[in-house]
């Protein structure tokens, strides 16, 4: 594949990932959060394990000490993140969810500086400040009274917690893979499996008999889309892109996800876009770019090389 074709494929992947916010918003109207988490990764399992068995036959089954880090990563980065992600979509818009989700590299960098003495360059500091300012605009929609009265949308706060979970996953996965000799594909496959196992009792707790009979084809197709296009195909294309054009250049394409989400949210879901949300989106994307651009060599770009899983 030429670099141009890889770039086009990464644009397509950004559309896949942005579509997960749209289909997630559709699906939460019919399924509770734990059920969506369970079914999304249950449907993805056959595909991701087939890829693991074909590409890395030596990594088919974890050995001894490899299980504990996989359990921790599966719990924090897959189960907790996606349960919170789907919960947030019950209360907030797909636009807000995607813009707050775009903060992942920023929060990852912030935690790396705070807990792992990661170096904070001027461009990364500016990126942090801009991104937090942008999310402030998105959450408040320019209404400063929300701040003084501490009245924030529940879904926005839940999504912020979800991003923190994924940032912790990002930092831990980088270290665990080096320490326990885990490949990105092996981590992805087994965190999917662990998520399915952990979410199953919660899925039963939500009493599936009360809602499964009334679910529609669009609800199931939304889950299937998230499983195949956002989780499996998105991962594969990102992995190819990292091999062809490198992790830093691949990470830049994540900045397109909020843009495509805004377009799809307006055209498909009929969500409204205010001037403050557009301003917030521009500021967030600028901040993320400053933090993830190749020259910055941020924690996020290093993480992209070792763990190719996206927040959608």
Tell me the role of every PLM-derived stretch.
Residues 20, 42-47, 100-114, 129, ...:
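Alpha-helical transmembrane segments of compact multi-pass small-molecule transporters, enriched
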Residues 27, 36, 40, 88, ...:
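Hydrophobic/aromatic residues within transmembrane alpha-helices
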Residues 16, 20-21, 49-101, 137, ...:
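Specific transmembrane alpha-helical segments of multi-pass solute transporters/efflux pumps
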Residues 1-11, 57-58, 105-164, 282-312:
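Juxtamembrane helix-loop boundary signature in multi-pass membrane transporters
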Residues 14, 37-39, 78, 82, ...:
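Helix-helix packing/entry segments at the starts of transmembrane helices
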Residues 5-9, 35-51, 72, 127-133, ...:
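Hydrophobic alpha-helical transmembrane segments of multi-pass integral membrane proteins
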Residues 14-18, 73-82, 105, 139, ...:
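Transmembrane alpha-helical core positions of polytopic small-molecule transporters
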Residues 23-26, 30, 44-62, 133-149, ...:
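Membrane-interface helix-cap regions at the ends of transmembrane helices
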């Amino acid at each position: 594949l030429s670099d141009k074709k890889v770039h086009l494929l990464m644009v397509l992947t950004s559309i896949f990932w942005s579509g997960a916010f749209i289909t997630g918003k559709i699906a939460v109207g019919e399924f509770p959060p734990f059920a969506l988490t369970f079914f999304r990764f249950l449907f993805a399992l056959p595909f991701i394990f087939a890829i693991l068995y074909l590409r890395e036959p030596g990594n088919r089954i974890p050995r001894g000490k490899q299980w504990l880090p996989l359990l921790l990563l599966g719990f924090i980065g897959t189960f907790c993140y996606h349960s919170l992600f789907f919960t947030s979509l019950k209360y907030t818009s797909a636009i807000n969810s995607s813009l707050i989700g775009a903060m992942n590299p920023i929060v990852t960098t912030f935690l790396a500086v705070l807990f792992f003495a990661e170096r904070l360059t001027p461009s990364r500091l500016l990126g942090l400040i801009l991104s937090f300012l942008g999310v402030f605009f998105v959450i408040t929609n320019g209404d400063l009274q929300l701040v003084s009265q501490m009245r924030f949308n529940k879904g926005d706060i839940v999504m912020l917690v979800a991003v923190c979970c994924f940032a912790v996953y990002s930092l831990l996965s980088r270290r665990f893979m080096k320490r326990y000799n885990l490949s990105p594909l092996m981590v992805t496959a087994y965190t999917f499996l662990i998520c399915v196992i952990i979410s199953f009792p919660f899925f039963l707790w939500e009493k599936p008999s009360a809602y499964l009979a009334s679910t529609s084809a669009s609800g199931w197709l939304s889950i299937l889309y998230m499983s195949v296009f956002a989780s499996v195909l998105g991962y594969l294309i990102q992995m190819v892109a990292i091999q062809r054009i490198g992790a830093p250049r691949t990470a830049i394409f994540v900045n397109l996800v909020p843009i495509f989400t805004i377009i799809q949210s307006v055209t498909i879901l009929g969500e409204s876009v205010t001037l403050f949300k557009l301003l917030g989106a521009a500021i967030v994307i600028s901040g993320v770019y400053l933090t993830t651009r190749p020259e910055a060599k941020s924690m996020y770009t290093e993480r992209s090389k070792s763990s190719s899983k996206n927040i959608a």
